């Protein structure tokens, strides 16, 4: 929708905001029922005069959207963190679990796949197919969330992943296996992006740190994959020296059991999302589409679910338009189909242009995307190929059982990372410094890891490295993408920014897969990963905007 507003300087905007808020408070005191609610607490909304954010975002958002979004933020603060948001925190976590089911699942089943299927030049080519799918999925689901809303991705991606994980378990050749993983990648590429945006747009600003804690579900998913690999792959796989000539399907069912279990769990999560947990479209997306009434309904739905008074009315949002010189007309409400058609006609790169509206925002966008690309290469070079590296590192006195036991221990230790990160990103160091410090420390430990000489030393060092790298992963990969990135971009363009970042991450994963295809499971990928993590830390120090202390708009 092409709506023009008068150009207003910062001082005039502050005066307008103050006048609007005072009128809103008076209206609410006079008209809203006051049963069991102290008069001074009814609809108390304070002006948010965040000059730093206003300067940072510039013309990337309209004054009307910014004021309405700040009003919604204050309403969410009044509602507080309640039953609805904690349920959403759990249901959104399902997406993180399934994301790990896919990313770690393909890594876990590649060794037995190579033993059973004939004609495989490099088993990691299946990872190449998977990452191609993820690149497509991240772009599609991220950008579409700005065009048609957050809910379609929220409800669809888990179903796609679950169905095709089960289907992949039934394949009997490498080409079909890789093709199905490409489809799985289209779902895995976008689900976590939208899950993070949805949680961010429903929680009060005081609880935005939960976006970092949300990634603890990802580590839980890694632990599930590790346990399934230990149970199924260690006990229902061909011997480690088997070849396609000696490894039959009947003797190698472990990887199939693993994928069927992962797919079944994903479908169960899908059922809960669609049929058990009821969620409206996010109010920030609705505001960006000019659908003020639906945004009011969404905010008040959260209030009712939390047992709180409804804090928002349509007249409050309309007052902002009137004070800015825009009078809403009575045009008929566009359907979802019409909104999609109009958005596609008007898109023409406008969402991307808005991400470079100011000098600082341009620098921020470029660095965020660069960091994501580098992490996309660094992380899978070590962690996605860890089971195969462990299996080949100490072949003389190791076994599949020992390999996956170690993998489970490392995964369990990694769960600590997100919880610690959620606390530390809220300290005086903020997001940027914690990202930079933890990334550099991770790189140092990865450099040292390749020097261990015994299996027990390898396990101990892997646990420490796993803790730090998962910790850095929350403060770099996950805190940047799934906490810092959505926090730092405005909702009208949040999906485009996050989706593009995720696409670059997945492109980095594709590069990592190609590197592994050429180098094999040697120490070379670990050295490369270590150097890249150090580089990420340096770039994090150059980010121009800190989201700690600022409520997302």
UniProtKB/Swiss-Prot annotation:
InterPro entries documented for this protein: MFS, MFS_dom, MFS_trans_sf
Q: Name one GO molecular function term.
A: transmembrane transporter activity
Q: Does the keyword Glycoprotein apply?
A: yes
What keywords tag this UniProt record? Cell membrane, Glycoprotein, Membrane, Transmembrane, Transmembrane helix, Transport
Membrane-spanning parts: 89-109, 128-148, 152-172, 174-194, 213-233, 257-277, 366-386, 409-429, 433-453, 459-481, 496-516, 525-545
CDD domains, A to Z: MFS_SV2_like
Q: How does it sit in the membrane?
A: Multi-pass membrane protein
Disulphide-bridged cysteine pairs: none
Glycosylated residues in this chain: 235
List localization entries. Cell membrane
One Pfam family, short name please? MFS_1
> Keyword Transmembrane on this protein?
yes
Induction of its expression? Expression is induced by nicotinate and 6-OH nicotinate, subject to nitrogen metabolite repression mediated by the GATA factor areA, and strictly regulated by the cluster-specific transcription regulator hnxR.
Sorted alphabetically, the Gene Ontology cellular component annotations on this record are: membrane; plasma membrane
Gene3D superfamilies registered for this protein in UniProt: MFS general substrate transporter like domains
Which family is annotated?
Belongs to the major facilitator superfamily.
Q: Which PANTHER family match?
A: MAJOR FACILITATOR-TYPE TRANSPORTER HXNZ-RELATED (PTHR23511:SF5), SYNAPTIC VESICLE GLYCOPROTEIN 2 (PTHR23511)
* Function text: Major facilitator-type transporter, part of the hnx cluster involved in the purine degradation. The nicotinate hydroxylase hnxS accepts nicotinate as a substrate and catalyzes the first step of nicotinate catabolism. The major facilitator-type transporters hxnP and hxnZ are probably involved in the uptake of nicotinate-derived metabolites, and the oxidoreductases hxnT and hxnY in the further metabolism of 6-OH nicotinic acid.
Protein name per Swiss-Prot or TrEMBL: Major facilitator-type transporter hxnZ
Q: Give the originating organism.
A: Emericella nidulans (strain FGSC A4 / ATCC 38163 / CBS 112.46 / NRRL 194 / M139) (Aspergillus nidulans)
């Amino acid at each position: 929708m092409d709506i023009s507003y008068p150009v207003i300087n910062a001082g005039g905007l502050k005066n307008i905001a103050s006048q609007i808020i005072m009128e809103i408070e008076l209206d609410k005191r006079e008209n809203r029922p006051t049963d069991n609610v102290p008069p001074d607490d009814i609809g108390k909304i304070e002006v948010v005069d965040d000059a730093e954010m206003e300067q940072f975002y510039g013309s990337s958002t309209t004054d009307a959207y910014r004021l309405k979004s700040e009003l919604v933020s204050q309403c969410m603060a009044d509602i507080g963190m309640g039953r609805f948001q904690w349920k959403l925190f759990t249901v959104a976590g399902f997406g993180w679990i399934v994301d790990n089911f896919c990313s770690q699942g393909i890594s876990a089943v590649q060794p037995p796949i190579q033993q059973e299927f004939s004609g495989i030049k490099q088993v990691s080519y299946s990872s190449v197919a998977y990452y191609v799918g993820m690149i497509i999925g991240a772009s599609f689901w991220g950008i579409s969330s700005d065009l048609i809303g957050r809910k379609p991705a929220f409800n669809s991606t888990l179903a796609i992943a679950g169905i095709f994980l089960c289907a992949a378990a039934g394949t009997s050749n490498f080409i079909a296996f890789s093709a199905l993983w490409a489809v799985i990648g289209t779902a895995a590429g976008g689900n976590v992006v939208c899950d993070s945006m949805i949680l961010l747009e429903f929680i009060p600003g005081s609880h935005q740190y939960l976006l970092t804690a949300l990634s603890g579900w990802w580590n839980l998913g890694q632990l599930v994959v590790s346990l399934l690999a230990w149970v199924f792959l260690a006990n229902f796989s061909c011997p480690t020296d088997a070849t396609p000539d000696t490894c039959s399907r009947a003797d190698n069912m472990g990887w199939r059991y693993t994928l069927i279990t992962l797919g079944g769990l994903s479908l169960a999560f899908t059922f809960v999302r669609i049929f058990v947990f009821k969620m409206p479209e996010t109010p920030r997306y609705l505001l960006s589409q000019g659908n003020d009434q639906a945004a009011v309904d969404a905010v008040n739905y959260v209030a009712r679910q939390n047992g709180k008074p409804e804090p928002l009315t349509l007249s409050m949002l309309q007052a902002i338009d009137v004070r800015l010189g825009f009078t809403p007309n009575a045009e008929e409400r566009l359907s979802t189909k019409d909104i999609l058609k109009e958005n596609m006609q008007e898109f023409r790169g406008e969402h991307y242009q808005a991400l470079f509206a100011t000098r600082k925002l341009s620098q921020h966008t470029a660095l965020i995307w660069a960091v994501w690309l580098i992490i996309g290469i660094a992380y899978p070079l070590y962690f996605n190929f860890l089971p195969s590296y462990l299996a080949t590192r100490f072949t003389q006195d190791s076994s599949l059982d020992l390999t996956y036991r170690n993998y489970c221990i490392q995964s369990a230790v990694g769960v600590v990372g997100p919880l610690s990160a959620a606390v530390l990103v809220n300290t005086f160091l903020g997001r940027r410094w914690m990202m930079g410090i933890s990334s550099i420390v991770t790189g140092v430990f990865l450099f040292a890891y390749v020097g261990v000489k015994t299996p027990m030393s390898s396990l101990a060092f892997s646990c420490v490295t796993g803790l730090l790298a998962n910790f850095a992963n929350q403060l770099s990969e996950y805190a940047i993408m799934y906490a810092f990135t959505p926090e730092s971009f405005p909702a009208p363009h949040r999906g485009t920014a996050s989706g593009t970042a995720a696409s670059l991450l997945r492109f980095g994963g594709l590069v990592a897969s190609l590197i592994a295809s050429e180098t094999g499971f040697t120490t070379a990928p670990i050295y490369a990963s270590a150097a890249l993590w150090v580089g990420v830390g340096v770039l994090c120090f150059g980010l121009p905007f800190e989201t700690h202390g600022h409520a997302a708009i």
